[in-house]
A protein has these predicted regions:
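A generic structural signal for well-ordered coil/turn residues at beta-strand boundaries
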Residues: 8, 16, 25, 81-86, ...
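Extended hydrophobic-aromatic, low-complexity segments
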Residues: 88, 98-101, 117-119, 125-126, ...
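Short peripheral tails and domain-boundary helices/loops at the edges of structured domains
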Residues: 35-53, 151-170
Length: 170
């Protein structure tokens, strides 16, 4: 069992099959590979169904879970790239023009501030801290317009072949 001390802004990568929990008082954005399965091994007395047998069978002991080691030569906005998703974090003071590939929608989450997502042929969508907007592949281009300073995370599928990120226990 490993305990990872976290601070605001830390990026933790948890590989599938890693038993993990989120400590009290934490607020997080959880991005995961596409899956319809969650095995609950403990539920803090909430009374939801547990999945002990299936959960134990799915555990991987060779987990690469830990704090993501940021690559110094890469994109400064990129928090993590994995074979299943990528996560970027940006502080916006000016509008951001973005395009969506045919392979991946974008999920834009406001971490601080508020903004509007605009695209030709659709109504503008306002969003603020803690809210997310899914930009589907049918929208080829969009603009994120901050109403004041806006900090966002943007999730999408990675492009090209991507290895597991480097991590460290902290």
């Amino acid at each position: 069992m490993n305990w990872i001390n976290v601070n605001a802004g830390d990026m933790i990568y948890v590989t599938a099959g890693t038993v993990h929990t989120i400590g009290g008082g934490m607020i997080l954005v959880e991005t995961q590979q596409s899956s319809d399965i969650t095995y609950r091994l403990y539920d803090y007395g909430r009374g939801r169904e547990l999945h002990i047998k299936d959960g134990i069978a799915a555990i991987k002991l060779d987990s690469k879970a830990g704090k993501v080691v940021r690559e110094s030569d890469g994109d400064p906005n990129m928090l993590v790239r994995s074979p299943f998703f990528q996560v970027e974090k940006m502080k916006l003071r000016e509008p951001l023009q973005a395009s969506v590939s045919r392979e991946s929608p974008h999920i834009v989450v406001a971490i601080e501030g508020a903004g509007i997502i605009e695209s030709a042929g659709m109504e503008p969508i306002s969003f603020a801290k803690g809210e997310a907007v899914v930009v589907p592949v049918s929208v080829p281009a969009y603009t994120v317009r901050p109403q004041w300073e806006l900090e966002v995370m943007r999730m999408s599928l990675p492009t090209g072949d991507v290895a597991e990120p480097r991590t460290m226990l902290g």
